Amino acid sequence: MKINVLTLFPDMFTPLQVSMLGRGLEDGKWDLNLVNFRDFTTDVHHHVDDTPYGGGAGMVLQIMPIKKALDSLPSTGKVIITAPQGKTFNEQMAQDWAKEDELTFICGHYEGFDQRVYDLADETVSIGDYVLTGGELPTMSMIDATVRLLPGILGNAASPVEESFSHGLLEYPQYTRPADFEGQKVPEVLTSGNHQKIAEWRHKEALKATYLHRPDMLEDRQLTNEEKKMLEEIKSELD
């Protein structure tokens, strides 16, 4: 996968070049192309923004340098703008994007984009109902969530399949050594060696975590008969 990022602050993307994603870059499993659209200005001072027509506070990013930066790319794939008014990013979107050959992100700053910039994008996406100083951090979050799903990025191929949101539930609790830490013991079922019981425990605990912390995720979920029974047990245990 190739990912292009149009940004005024390419140095902000250094974190994507370390850890598992960094190793993936080195191994050629994905490619990151950072494009500073200030380089596509034509005036002496390299302005990328101007005052808004009709008046108002702040500065608005101009379409010209962004359009020229896009046109400079041999290809773009799906073009994505990060903005507060966009649809909220989620795991399903990450899974869909991970199937693409190429993605291009456009990062905003200041008071946002000239409205005509949005016409250049296929999707406008947000990471939540709050405002940041620019689109770089949301873009990095979305790149991380997407790239980690690519083959060979994570050490354990099963990891992205088993974790939170992959099956529509939050992740079950996990434990490692020691089995007893200051009286806090690992649930016996996890050390029993009974894989069926362990799977049942994990399923129920994932359902419990979702019920307690993200009940909204259960509203649209078609619960199996087994899950309905588990949920009744969970509610009874919590009463």
From Swiss-Prot:
Signal peptide: none annotated. The keyword Hydrolase does not apply. It catalyses: guanosine(37) in tRNA + S-adenosyl-L-methionine = N(1)-methylguanosine(37) in tRNA + S-adenosyl-L-homocysteine + H(+). Its main location: cytoplasm. InterPro entries: Alpha/beta_knot_MTases, tRNA_m1G_MeTrfase_C_sf, tRNA_m1G_MeTrfase_TrmD, tRNA_m1G_MTases_N, tRNA_MeTrfase_TRMD/TRM10. S-adenosyl-L-methionine binds at residues 108, 127-132. It comes from the Bacteria. Specifically methylates guanosine-37 in various tRNAs. Homodimer. Belongs to the RNA methyltransferase TrmD family. This is tRNA (guanine-N(1)-)-methyltransferase. It comes from Lactobacillus helveticus (strain DPC 4571). The lineage of its organism: Bacteria, Bacillati, Bacillota, Bacilli, Lactobacillales.
